């Protein structure tokens, strides 16, 4: 029931979206969503917005924060979706550096809610939606405000204690780095090989290697005083998949 606006840096992308003002979803979710407008002007996108959801790789969090901070207004909620690790801390750091005193909530999700790929502008393929994605605010005293703004609108987001937990809950360090390095020969093959990163690239041996790496993440969580599910447990819980289909 909330109006949705989109911000993008590509004028061509924005122009095409504004022609239809729709985004079509396929596979795990079927339907067509309507947007209010798309724009390359971050101030226009943020003006009057209650909830601002930042969906982009973590290497751009700082630069986007610098664009966004001058336009932040009291009462707004920003959710880094996902934050990777320590994204909320980086965002707050930029706010402090730029002298921003706006009373805003900065939240962080440990991972992206959906597994998806764009098919063409305005059309996306949803492979799956996670059953639950933990989120938290920085500072944690804002958790109730974050829950009211985000969890009440999108029930898949569930509140956890703090952004330290969401940062440790980031699985990308295991699932992206190791399989990519161990598939270097496929990636560099000439002629190029067409393979599916997860289904073909994560063999039983690579899966075991990833699980071994994951033990360090679990140990860090334990040392910090909280329980952390293993990467195998997380994937089974998130996608309701059987053990035999989990790397």
Predicted regions and their residues:
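Rossmann-like NAD(P)(H) cofactor-binding subdomain of soluble oxidoreductases
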Residues: 58-120
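Substrate/ligand-engaging "lid" and interaction regions
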Residues: 93, 113-213
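Rossmann-like NAD(P)-binding element
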Residues: 29-79
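Generic structural signal for residues in well-ordered beta-strands
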Residues: 4, 38, 106, 158-161
């Amino acid at each position: 029931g909330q109006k949705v606006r989109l911000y993008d840096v590509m004028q061509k992308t924005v122009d095409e979206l504004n022609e239809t003002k729709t985004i079509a979803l396929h596979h795990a979710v079927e339907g067509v969503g309507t947007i209010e407008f798309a724009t390359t002007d971050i101030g226009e996108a943020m003006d009057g917005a209650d909830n601002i959801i930042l969906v982009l790789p973590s290497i751009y969090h700082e630069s986007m924060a610098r664009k966004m901070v001058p336009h932040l207004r009291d009462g707004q909620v920003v959710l880094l979706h996902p934050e990777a690790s320590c994204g909320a801390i980086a965002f707050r750091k930029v706010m402090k550096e730029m002298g921003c005193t706006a009373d805003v909530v900065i939240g962080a999700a440990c991972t992206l809610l959906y597994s998806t790929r764009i098919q063409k502008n305005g059309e996306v393929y949803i492979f799956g939606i996670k059953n639950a994605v933990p989120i938290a605010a920085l500072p944690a005293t804002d958790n109730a405000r974050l829950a009211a703004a985000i969890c009440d609108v999108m029930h898949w987001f569930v509140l956890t204690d703090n952004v330290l937990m969401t940062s440790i809950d980031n699985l990308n360090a295991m699932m992206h780095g190791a399989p990519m390095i161990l598939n270097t020969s496929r990636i560099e093959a000439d002629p190029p090989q067409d393979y599916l990163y997860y289904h073909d690239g994560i063999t039983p041996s690579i899966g075991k290697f990833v699980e071994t790496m994951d033990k360090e993440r679990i140990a860090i969580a334990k040392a910090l005083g909280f329980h952390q599910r293993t990467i195998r447990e997380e994937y089974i819980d998130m996608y309701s998949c059987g053990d035999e289909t989990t790397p």
